[in-house]
Amino acid sequence: MSWQTYVDDHLMCDIEGTGHHLSSAAILGFDGSVWAQSPNFPKFKAEEITNIMKDFDEPGHLAPTGLFLAGTKYMVIQGEPGAVIRGKKGPGGITIKKTAQALIFGVYEEPVTPGQCNMVVEKIGDYLVDQGY
């Protein structure tokens, strides 16, 4: 299965039969290289990925300044140190799951809930971890 298929079929899927979808999603390498992304995934800056990686290595690094993706600031909320970073901005937010080799991004807006985004991103992330990625 191609990386793009994971994004198209597993990240940008209909969530729990609600007819709702994430706003955008991507799978990136630790260096910020794009393995696959939805057409509207934001154009991020390399230093934003560097800061996200630093937060995985040093949990809490992003808390004082916020998480930035394509210049959009998200308030960092409870995650799983070294494994998941979650951010909130108004009625939407972001979930980032770190696997052995990749970062799985899911960005959402209402009516998608934070819990639904977490479920979608972390489910595919856990699957990729189990597959050695």
Curated annotation (Swiss-Prot):
GO terms for molecular function: actin monomer binding. The keyword Cytoplasm applies. Keywords: Actin-binding, Cytoplasm, Cytoskeleton. The keyword Cytoplasm applies. Occurs in many kinds of cells as a complex with monomeric actin in a 1:1 ratio. It is found in: Cytoplasm, Cytoskeleton. This is Profilin-1. InterPro entries: PFN (IPR048278), PFN_euk (IPR005455), PFN_sf (IPR036140), Profilin_CS (IPR027310). Ubiquitous. GO terms for cellular component: cell cortex; cytoskeleton.
